[in-house]
Swiss-Prot record:
Reaction(s) the record says it catalyses: N-succinyl-(2S,6S)-2,6-diaminopimelate + H2O = (2S,6S)-2,6-diaminopimelate + succinate
InterPro entries membership: ArgE/DapE_CS, Bact_exopeptidase_dim_dom, DapE_proteobac, Peptidase_M20, Peptidase_M20_dimer, Peptidase_M20A
Keywords, ordered alphabetically: Amino-acid biosynthesis, Cobalt, Diaminopimelate biosynthesis, Hydrolase, Lysine biosynthesis, Metal-binding, Zinc
Protein's UniProt name: Succinyl-diaminopimelate desuccinylase
Active site per database record: D71, E135 (proton acceptor)
Organism of derivation: Ruegeria pomeroyi (strain ATCC 700808 / DSM 15171 / DSS-3)
Length: 380
């Protein structure tokens, strides 16, 4: 059985699965996988649709896993598109539509490669496919739910490949072997409102906020590591909601976003920021409240057997030697890393989340070939 990955991508694009909606995307995959002999289970939780599929024996010591998502971001202004966002139109060698790059093509390429493998040369082992509809959203009931189901059901993956688009410009140029952690901290500084002509009768929260933001932003977190760039902290907002120039506001709010490497944890950075907030509160005689959300901790899959396997397949199919990287934002690999070794590889992500998102059709077939080689080499 040979499955056309580009056609499957088009079928998925026609599902308007704007997160958290599914619009039949997982039904498309379940039908294809079931016909190839995969045991499929819906792992829906919290209104989110998820699919777990396994070919082969449960708990097999040699189990290759794949993780991806079928939910997509909103299309924005549909009138700005030159094609229907969910029409899966082909034009000049490209397939257009929301999710074409991120990441319905990656899901389709792996499913097609896996179906070809198990129906033509069944391996000694198991192939596991985990697909969520909650990667672009809050990511609370997506891959987390799938991993919870696996733990409770005795399912396991020896290794996992996440099919996010990892290549910035050229097919095959980059494999992700880790990701930086991400966290956001919100600060509220409370003083005493007053007339700007009588500042001694007020307690202005703005100088305190400015001092706090300066202390945080001017502090070099680290110099990076062998596999990670230096951690970064960005001031993303400072706001009082005050439009009156003769009023000293009572409150000021600010926020920072930190992308951190494995020299830090969310807890260690929270402790550092709380210490800075306490010092500023004491210096200015104001109250400083901090709230934190840790979206994900940093992680690294050290270069070795898994990254070598993927890199060899990429080079064999593209002629490009991939760089092992930890750059970019977060992905669901941050959850998978607690289950098994994980790396990420997919196609060029230049148009993801953009108007007229599109994927080169030849790249879909090339990605299927890469995934197929990875699977064959893993089970060899």
């Amino acid at each position: 059985m040979t499955l056309d990955a580009a056609r499957l991508t088009a079928d998925l694009i026609r599902c308007a699965s704007v997160t958290p909606a599914d619009d039949g995307a997982l039904d498309v995959l379940e039908r294809v996988l079931s016909q190839a002999g995969f045991s499929c289970t819906r792992v829906d939780r919290g209104g989110i649709c998820n699919l777990f599929a396994r070919w082969g024996d449960k708990g097999h010591a040699r189990s290759f896993g794949f993780n991806g998502h079928t939910d997509v971001v909103p299309v924005g202004d549909a009138a700005a598109w030159t094609v229907a966002p969910f029409g899966a139109e082909e034009k000049d060698g490209f397939l257009y539509g929301r999710g074409a790059t991120d990441m319905k093509s990656g899901v389709a390429a792996f499913v097609a490669a896996a179906v070809d493998l198990v129906t033509t040369t069944p391996p000694e082992g198991a192939v596991i496919v985990t697909i969520t509809g909650d990667e672009e959203g809050d990511a609370l009931d997506g891959t987390k739910a799938l991993l919870d189901y696996m733990a409770a059901s005795g399912e396991r993956m020896s290794v996992c490949l996440v099919g996010e688009p990892t290549c910035p410009d050229r097919m095959g140029e980059m494999i992700k072997i880790g990701r930086r952690g991400s966290m956001t901290a919100w600060f509220t500084v409370t003083g005493v409102q007053g007339h700007s002509a009588y500042p001694h009768r007020a307690k202005n929260p703005l100088p305190a906020m400015a001092r706090l933001m300066d202390r945080l932003a001017s502090h070099g977190l680290d110099q990076g590591t062998d596999h990670f760039d230096p951690s970064t902290l960005a001031v993303v907002t400072i706001d009082t909601g005050n439009t009156a120039t003769n009023v000293i506001p009572a409150q000021c709010r600010g926020a920072v976003n930190i992308r951190f490497n494995d020299l830090h944890s969310g807890a260690s950075l929270t402790g550092w920021m709380q210490g800075e907030a306490d010092r500023v509160a004491e210096e200015f005689g104001v109250a400083v409240e901090m709230k934190v959300k840790i979206s994900g901790e940093s992680f690294l899959t050290p270069p070795g057997e898994l990254s070598d396997l993927v890199a060899a397949a990429v080079e064999a199919e593209t002629g490009v030697t991939p760089v092992l990287s930890t750059s970019g934002g977060t992905s669901d690999a941050r959850f998978v890393k607690d289950h098994c070794p994980v790396v990420e590889f997919g196609l060029v992500g230049r148009t993801m989340h953009q108007v007229d998102e599109r994927v080169e059709i030849a790249q879909i077939h090339q990605l299927k070939a890469i995934y197929g080689r990875i699977l064959r080499d893993f089970f060899a």
